[in-house]
Amino acid sequence: MAQHAVYFPDAFLTQMREAMPSTLSFDEFISACQRPLRRSIRINTLKISVADFLALIAPYGWSLTPIPWCHEGFWIERDDEEALPLGSTAEHLSGLFYIQEASSMLPVAALFADDNHPQRVMDMAAAPGSKTTQIAARMGNRGAILANEFSASRVKVLHANISRCGIANTALTHFDGRVFGAALPEMFDAILLDAPCSGEGVVRKDPDALKNWSPESNLDIAATQRELLNSAFHALRPGGTLVYSTCTLNRQENEEVCLWLKETYADAVEFLPLGDLFPDADRALTPEGFLHVFPQIYDCEGFFVARLRKMSSLPAMPAPGYKVGAFPFTPLKGREALHVTQAANAVGLLWDENLHLWQREKEVWLFPAEIESLIGKVRFSRLGIKLAESHNKGYRWQHEATIALACPTHAHAFELSVQEAEEWYRGRDIYPQTPPAADDVLVTFQHQPLGLAKRIGARIKNSYPRELVRDGKLFTGNS
């Protein structure tokens, strides 16, 4: 694999020599940093099993190598990347997989280690959504995830990825993560803090990542990380699990931040060793039980992961100063709820007791039950999934609800051919040789829901959202 020129400040190299254990070669570190990063994907098991996905893509000639810490993760090599980018494949568009760097799958693996089954989880710095969607898959779309993102522009990307992957158990917030310890004290069974960092581990993806690097900026970032970790620890319930991770390599932003928490709260903090997380994990193990992944160890991005347990309750932080405001939704119950449920079921949209119906004017939403105790304590950017808009003739079912809830074996399901699916993704109506009998059609491809549509005579009217419409080649092996 070709080398590429990476910019290394001298002070960074000095720091890495000091941080790297004697068992590792510094020359191999430099060599690994100069190799382009291997691409990797994570199969979305909310949509398809690993075995079924591998069978589906077998004819494509993709070379997949298992990632040892993530059963559904694979390094991928393809010959047709220029003709058809991985992100434009039909399997990606329908949410069957997520393009995710291998080492970034480690934090969620750590969060769910030792048969941990949290019901309410916070992803404190969630965009673009790789870890949120990985958490949702591990939870089987049950329970609830509060996915927070400080950057307003990245909240939109986060929602788009959650929607594409068919996730229904998530609430989105847009806050500085430092508010949660005070706003939601001891409310979460598990928290992932993938902290903002200096990004020293990403030079294989971005050779200029260290252009603005300095030891002083690392210390400033570490101060922010301590504040975020303190907030996360207060928001965690006693007995809960917290994973702290970064994509950087210096000790100040990694081990020292975690040791600061231990020094501050002493017996309330228990470090949970990660040496048994996967075969060969001990190659990256620190004396504290953390994983400090230098890029040459597993041929991936540099990364750091620590897991800890909260052993006892803490005194409350000062109450937050913001006002939440009136909640604009009301629960939908009784006859109205039954009517909506029956109408949705009739077109193939199904859900269980984990999701509850709420209403705002003519909008009908589904919220995860586990999130309801947080209502009134924090403002949500988006909560659950929008199911429908009501009108005089019934309901206008929403695309994100179809992707998350539709049953592809429903009587109204209509499986498209490859050519018809290409037309669908391009926003065009479908003219099947044998039109479906029903007026309301659940359009599927590869037995995955693509949308709900109306049959008008012999034509299926396209309902694919305009902002998602694609042009160009979409299907592997199809010219």
Swiss-Prot record:
One of its GO terms (molecular function) is RNA binding. S-adenosyl-L-methionine binds at residues 125-131, 149, 176, 194. Gene3D superfamilies: 3.10.450.720, Vaccinia Virus protein VP39. SUPFAM superfamilies: S-adenosyl-L-methionine-dependent methyltransferases. It is an enzyme of class 2 (transferase). It comes from the Bacteria. Belongs to the class I-like SAM-binding methyltransferase superfamily. RsmB/NOP family. This is Ribosomal RNA small subunit methyltransferase F. It comes from Salmonella heidelberg (strain SL476).
